[in-house]
Amino acid sequence: MGPVPFAGQGRYGLAAMAILTQHTPREAREPRGFAGGIASLADDQLYALQNPFALDGRVSSYPASARGFAVANSYLLTQPDAAMLIDTGFGKDEPVIRAQIESLIAPGLPLSMFPLRLNEFMSINNVESFAGHFNVETCYTSNIDAALWFDFGAKAEGRDILKSMKVTAVTRADTIELGKDGRAIDVMQAPIRLIATRWLYDRATRTLFSSDMFTHIWRDTATGPWIVTDADNDPTSLRGVRSFMLNTRYWWLEGAPTDSIRRGIGNVFDKYDIETIAPGYGCILRGRNVVERHYRMLDEFLKSCDKSVAVSRYVTRDEER
């Protein structure tokens, strides 16, 4: 699927990249352009920390033929007395992401981290660095020995930081409470996954953090915009979603038993009131109509792939569908 053009600012007043409200510190409101940006998804509650990367055929998360730019998304959930970072970003972006976090929370504020994909760089690359720089209260993971996964050539002090970092293991169906007011964040095993993955749902902002799913929209330029809203003329098609899925890590779905996957995803959308889908990379989907449309396209794609109607076959390395 080709890049999706922007069709104007949405009714939420977000021009997607580095646009914040007057209540946010000045340094956080200033556009960061090619160096990344901050998007306020809910004032004083949820921010997307966005840092672009080029699509030049070397990024396995996108089809080999994709050209343009995508964006790695980290998310900062904030309360007056605590904050949580979802995914820590690529190591190349560590200084920028660190500055983004510093612009949004007070020094010393308790910070928790939750990398949703334990074996993917854009999720875990900066755990050790941030644990050493911020007042990290805990790191939520699906694996109690996850600290062993976060050592990317760290020096002795880095390894000591990881050893002393508190790790909180979460189950496949759990709830985290953020801050003394107990802001509820529901944890679930991703109903569609290739690697160990969790999805989260933030009740306060009605946001589903979908990790490596719903990542199928990229742009022509590094400046985005990186949010699709109800007001946009979003040209994403079922054919485009199908091509994206079959030319990335979910190439194996054609001819697989997808009915159970469809039921799992459907249960999530039936259970939760979702106004925003916040993927780990690619454009954020914002607004009930946008969310519903992209969910339906994914469901139709999965339906067409089921073994009852499709045949599994060998796919060569360079073949695109």
What is each model feature region?
Residues G2, A7-A82:
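Zn-dependent metallo-beta-lactamase
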Residues R29, L41, Y140-T197, A256-P257, ...:
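Metallo-beta-lactamase
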Residues Q45-N51, L85-D87, A184-Q189, L208-D212:
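Active-site-proximal beta-strand elements of phosphoester/diester hydrolases
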Residues D56, L118-N125, A146-W149, D174, ...:
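Active-site environment of divalent metal-dependent phosphoester hydrolases
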Residues L77-P80, L178-K180, L200-A204:
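Active-site beta-strand termini and strand-to-loop segments that position acidic
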Residues I86-T88, P110-N119, C139-S142, L208-D212, ...:
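Active-site neighborhood of phospho(di)ester-bond hydrolases with catalytic His/Asp-centered motifs
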Residues E102-I176, R296-E300:
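Active-site HxH/HxHxD metal-binding segment of metal-dependent hydrolases
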Residues I217-R321:
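Cap/insert and terminal regions of metallo-dependent hydrolase folds
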